[in-house]
């Protein structure tokens, strides 16, 4: 069997995965707080025919060896946690993070998840929740007779209640940072989960220790650049076509051999 057939096959598999990732990025171009991904690849093991530095004669050595590669494989998908644009909504419950950090979210199983999507809502009890209904940590309850909600840059939440002139302090929204954001596991629903690779969560007041600040009435949009993804798609398509051509050429060579 001609090795180039299998080598090209690994190239096809790799480019298909790359296309899947690009398609997912483009599909989430309108998803609040979405962070685009990129595929990371590495070459497979090599077959060493001649080692560099071995003797070519009694007095000379080979300056370079002869190694034949066996293809490529995907290693990981890396999240690119760059800042997305802030889109003005004027909704009092919308909060965007300008800078680093994540909001904390309580999951039904008791675990904690993290999100950049600050398009919050109120449930039937007046509690601040995500669009999927998951409560924000710490628990924030907005009184039903509130006339104005204020979320400061440092995360302090206060409201003005009917019949009163002084604002009532409700709580503090802190942000969570990680040593390695790319190590977070994506759960869907704009949520991430801590892993061993991400490191432990570090809770910080917005605006302190390099953490981002909060902007009320804004949401962070996806950081997907459509033009860049389309260029990546064209490159991936061309790479797929080239690997397909390699398979066709190898097949033609094999046919020639079988006719001898």
Curated annotation (Swiss-Prot):
PROSITE patterns assigned to the protein according to its UniProt record, in alphabetical order: FLAGELLA_BB_ROD
Domain of life: Bacteria
Keyword annotations from UniProtKB, A to Z: Bacterial flagellum
Keyword flag Ligase: no
Compartments in which it is found: Bacterial flagellum basal body
GO biological process, any: bacterial-type flagellum-dependent swarming motility
One GO cellular component, as annotated: bacterial-type flagellum basal body, distal rod
InterPro entries listed in its UniProt record: Flag_bb_rod_N, Flagellar_basal_body_rod_CS, Flagellar_FlgE/F/G, Flg_bb/hook_C_dom, FlgE/F/G-like, FlgG_G_neg, LlgE_F_G-like_D1
Complex formation: The basal body constitutes a major portion of the flagellar organelle and consists of four rings (L,P,S, and M) mounted on a central rod. The rod consists of about 26 subunits of FlgG in the distal portion, and FlgB, FlgC and FlgF are thought to build up the proximal portion of the rod with about 6 subunits each.
Family: Belongs to the flagella basal body rod proteins family.
Protein name: Flagellar basal-body rod protein FlgG
Originating organism: Buchnera aphidicola subsp. Acyrthosiphon pisum (strain APS)
Lineage of the species this protein comes from: Bacteria, Pseudomonadati, Pseudomonadota, Gammaproteobacteria, Enterobacterales
């Amino acid at each position: 069997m001609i090795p180039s057939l299998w080598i090209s096959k690994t190239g096809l598999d790799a480019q298909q995965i790359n296309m899947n990732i690009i398609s997912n990025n483009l599909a989430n171009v309108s998803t609040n707080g979405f962070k685009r991904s990129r595929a990371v690849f590495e070459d497979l093991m090599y077959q060493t025919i001649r080692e560099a530095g071995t003797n070519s004669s009694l007095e000379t050595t080979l300056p370079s060896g002869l190694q034949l590669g066996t293809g490529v494989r995907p290693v990981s998908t890396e999240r690119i946690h760059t800042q997305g644009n802030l889109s003005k909504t004027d909704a009092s419950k919308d909060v965007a993070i300008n800078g680093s950090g994540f909001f904390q979210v309580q999951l039904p199983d008791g675990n904690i998840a993290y999100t950049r999507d600050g398009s919050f809502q109120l449930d039937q009890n007046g509690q601040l929740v995500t669009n999927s209904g998951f409560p924000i940590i710490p628990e924030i309850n907005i009184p039903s007779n509130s006339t104005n909600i204020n979320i400061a840059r440092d995360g302090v939440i206060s409201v003005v209640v009917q019949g009163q002139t002084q604002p009532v302090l409700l709580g503090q929204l802190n942000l969570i940072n990680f040593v390695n954001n790319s190590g977070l596991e994506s759960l869907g629903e704009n949520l991430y989960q801590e892993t061993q690779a991400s490191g432990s969560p570090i809770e910080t007041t917005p605006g302190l220790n390099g953490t981002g600040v909060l902007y009320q009435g804004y949401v962070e949009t996806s950081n997907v650049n459509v033009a860049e993804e389309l260029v990546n798609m064209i490159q991936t398509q061309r790479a797929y076509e080239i690997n397909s051509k390699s398979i066709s050429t190898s097949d033609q060579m094999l046919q020639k051999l079988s006719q001898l």
